[in-house]
Regions:
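Structural signature of eukaryotic scaffold interfaces centered on beta-propeller domains
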Residues: 1-23, 64-86, 129-138
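Structural motif
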Residues: 25-32, 95-104, 149-162, 183-188
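Conserved blade-ending motifs and adjacent loop-strand segments that build the rim/top face
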Residues: 40-74, 107-138, 145, 150-154, ...
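Sequence/structural signature of beta-propeller modules
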Residues: 49, 161-192
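Internal helical hairpin/lid segments
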Residues: 72-122
């Protein structure tokens, strides 16, 4: 009868005709396909795994233990912001400070931790934010970016680097003076 407010730390999305889901207190990704459910991927974080006996005991013992694990980053309690592609599984373990985005290469099983964005990319894509999705036709991840934030970031680039378009050619034709700060979010596409 253990009860903890779990918040919204879970993911749901589509991949290859199925629907994937993740849930709190679980580092598996499940694939729903019709009437069946399969474990699609299991992540092992070694010493950062939630102990197998974590849920043994009464609520009055478990709540302080849970708070200790959560507040002191002692375990990966779940995965969130999940995006699945043919080559990658991308997710973010929530509640970690600093946040980290983990890119798991499905072909070789290696992990990349993308916590070193800097400058323009950090401001626009978020230094520790997972992508919002993936376009399988172009092979690009995408992220929704606030128009006012994008305008400000481009203006800063213009002032600090007169050759910024050589470094960021995808900004050609984007004039911050013509951008409406009140417009809908922009979609930025990028590859890993």
């Amino acid at each position: 009868n253990f009860w903890i407010v779990q918040g919204c730390y879970r993911s749901i999305g589509g991949y290859n005709g199925g629907t994937y889901v993740s849930n709190y207190f679980d580092t598996n990704i499940y694939m729903l396909d019709g009437d069946s459910i399969q474990t699609f991927a299991t992540f092992d974080f070694g010493s950062m795994n939630l102990p197998k006996d974590f849920f043994e005991g009464e609520t009055k013992e478990l709540v302080p233990k849970f708070n200790d694990f959560r507040e002191n980053n002692k375990a990966v309690l779940n995965i969130d912001n999940t995006t699945i592609t043919d080559d990658w599984i991308v997710f973010c373990p929530p509640l970690f400070e600093p946040k980290e985005v983990i890119y798991c290469n499905r072909k070789n099983g290696k992990y990349l931790i993308n916590n070193d964005f800097s400058g323009f990319y950090a401001k626009v894509l978020g230094k520790y934010d997972a992508p919002d999705g993936y376009d399988s036709r172009s092979g690009e991840f995408y992220r929704l970016v606030n128009a006012a934030l994008l305008k400000e970031a481009i203006e800063e680039l213009q002032q600090s680097d007169e050759h910024y378009l050589e470094k960021y050619p995808f900004l050609k034709g984007t004039d911050p003076e013509k951008m409406d700060e009140e417009s809908n979010d922009w979609v930025i596409f990028f590859k890993t």
